[in-house]
Structures are given as C-alpha cells and as structure tokens.
C-alpha cells in the first residue's frame, strides 16, 4: 500500500489514498480534541502523527499489542478496540472501517468515531504519567495491565465517549462475571471511563485529570482510596456500581 500524508496545524496523518477524506476528518477531530484538552492539561507540544490503517490486520501487524488486548477484552468491549497510542503516534483504524465495526445499538457508531480523540487523550496523559503507556515496555507490562483502567478510562472520558458507551455497558452487565472494582484489564476499555465520569461528577474535572496524570499506587485499590477520600473503598465501590447501573439504564 502506498502511504499518503495529510497535515494540519499540530498533526500529520499517514493513510491510504482512498482514505483521504477520512484523514481530513480525523485531523479536524484531533485539532478539536487538542484544544479541549488544553483547558485541562498540557497537550503535547510536538507534532503527533495519526497512522490510519485500512484493516484490523494492518493495525495488528503495526502494533502487535493490539491482538493481545483484543484477546483479553470482554466481548462487549472488543469491537471498540480501534487503535493504540505510541509516544509520538496514534495508530488507528480508518473511520470507514470503524463504522463497519459498529453495532446497531445507539451510541456504538458515535463511540467508535471518537476513537482518534480517545487515543490522543491516552497519548497526552501517558506523556504526563510515567507509569502509563505509551511507551509499553516489557519491564512495565504488568504495571500497564494493572492500570489499564486508568489509561483506557481517561481516554474514554476526555474524548466524550462515556455517554455513548451506555448500551455496551448494559450488555456487559448482563454478560460474564460481575465486573471488578477497579475494572480489570478485560473491562478497562469499556468500563474505565465510568470511574472518571463518577469522579468528575463528584469532585470536578481536575480531580479526574489528577487521577489520569498522577503516578498510581502499586495497589489499584490504594489509588482509588486516594482518588475518592472521605469514605471507605467499599462504599465507593457501591456508589460506582450504582453509577454503572444508571449508565446502563439511561
């Protein structure tokens, strides 16, 4: 495949020639996301590249972690694995491919089309948080898995995906075992944003940004206790499960 390059003020996009219009829309979304993020945190000052893949196989070949994460992900969240961030690039599926992965339930297409913004938010938070990827190194893989709910959750919340995740959350609550708190690596992509949504609703957006960018504790439950002070972790878990149920029922 011959790569074509498109540019905007702060981003470049490398893509197949047939994805030229999609690339323009991705760049516009990324510029909007950068402007919105700048109100909450310091966005990357260097140019970030969006590498737009025309198939899941191409994405997996470029980012071998993607099929691993796909295998771990719960069935309800698997379709929303749309890419992966590196230190200076985000690799993602072309919007036309994302659209083909959407289910018929409300919000599925919208959530998928916001994937570039979510991946960029993950990259931005990973730059500020030394424990989160990118980059993902073998030595830090266990910590990355333990804190996957933070990495995926901050991207979902900051990009505005969380409201669109409601039908998928409802499906997840009906399928499989009871979700853990914080969400496990298999549920991080779908349920991680709900933790940030709850935190922002209770304490404001800056509290959620602090969770995304501050080094987490070795024990995720200690990270949660620090993020939600003033009540027991058991009580916070109950509030979170009630919040999940509200999201699922909306």
What spans do the regions from the language model cover?
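Surface-exposed patches in mature extracellular/periplasmic domains of secreted proteins
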Residues: 38-53, 131-137, 169-170, 207-214
């Amino acid at each position: 495949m011959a790569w074509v390059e498109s540019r905007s003020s702060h981003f470049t996009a490398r893509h197949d020639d047939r994805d030229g219009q999609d690339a323009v829309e991705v760049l516009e979304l990324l510029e909007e996301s950068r402007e919105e993020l700048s109100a909450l945190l310091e966005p990357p000052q260097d140019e970030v590249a969006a590498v737009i893949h025309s198939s899941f196989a191409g994405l997996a070949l470029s980012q071998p972690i993607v099929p691993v994460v796909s295998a771990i992900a719960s069935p309800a969240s698997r379709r929303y694995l749309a890419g992966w961030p590196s230190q200076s690039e985000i690799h993602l599926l072309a919007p036309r491919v994302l659209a083909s992965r959407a289910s018929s339930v409300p919000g599925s297409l919208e959530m998928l089309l916001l994937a570039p913004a979510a991946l960029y938010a993950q990259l931005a938070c990973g730059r500020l948080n030394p424990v989160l990827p990118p980059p993902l190194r073998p030595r830090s893989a266990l910590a990355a898995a333990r804190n996957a709910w933070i990495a995926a959750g901050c991207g979902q919340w900051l990009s505005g995906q969380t409201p669109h995740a409601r039908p998928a959350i409802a499906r997840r609550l009906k399928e499989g075992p009871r979700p853990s708190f914080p969400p496990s690596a298999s549920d991080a992509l779908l349920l991680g944003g709900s933790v940030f949504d709850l935190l922002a609703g209770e304490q404001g957006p800056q509290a959620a940004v602090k969770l995304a960018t501050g080094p987490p504790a070795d024990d995720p439950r200690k990270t949660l206790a620090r993020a939600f002070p003033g009540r027991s972790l058991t009580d916070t878990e109950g509030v979170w499960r009630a919040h999940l149920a509200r999201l699922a029922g909306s």
